[in-house]
Regions:
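A short gly/proline-enriched turn/hairpin at secondary-structure junctions
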Residues: 31-35
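Unchanged
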Residues: 37-131
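Short, flexible beta-strand-to-coil junctions
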Residues: 14-16, 24-29, 68-71
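Conserved N-terminal beta-strand and adjoining loop/helix that marks the start
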Residues: 1-20, 73
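Amphipathic, alpha-helical segments enriched in basic
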Residues: 22, 26, 50-52
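Short, well-ordered strand-loop elements centered on a beta-strand within folded domains, enriched
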Residues: 17-22, 85-87
Length: 131
């Protein structure tokens, strides 16, 4: 029985690994998009749903990793949105704004090492979601 309860989304542009999307949670600060799995929901489905709910962006799930987060999955998602320094407003009431990051924000909800471990992960070693 799989006991993982949540997903974290590493959303990258289609053609680069130099920028990623984070959301500024009103109570926790900057973090990767993500949230709890719903009953019967596959991790990649939850990742795409959470990404859309928190950022308004659609993407394509490319790979999944089970070992990066205790109790959760990290899903690599590629998005067709141009990298821009301008943040945008989320329709999720708990999210102040969403935006592209080129470096780890100071007011992050997670430790810098934890964020860096997700950014540095070698996705070639993870389970591919591509056919």
């Amino acid at each position: 029985m799989d006991d993982k309860q949540f997903v974290v989304v590493l959303a990258l542009p289609m053609d680069s690994d130099d920028a990623w999307i984070m959301v500024k949670n009103k109570s926790r600060g900057w973090e990767f998009p993500g949230g709890n799995l719903r009953t019967g929901e596959a991790p990649e489905e939850a990742a795409l749903r959470e990404l859309y709910e928190e950022t308004g962006i659609l993407g394509t799930a490319k790979a999944i990793e089970e070992s990066l987060m205790l109790g959760g999955y990290v899903v690599l998602v590629r998005v067709e949105r141009e990298v821009s320094p301008d943040p945008w407003i989320s329709s999720d009431d708990s999210i102040e704004e969403a935006g592209w990051c080129l470096q780890i924000p100071e007011s992050s909800a997670w430790g810098k090492e934890e964020i860096q471990s997700v950014l540095d992960h070698d996705w070639r070693t993870s389970s591919s979601l591509e056919s």
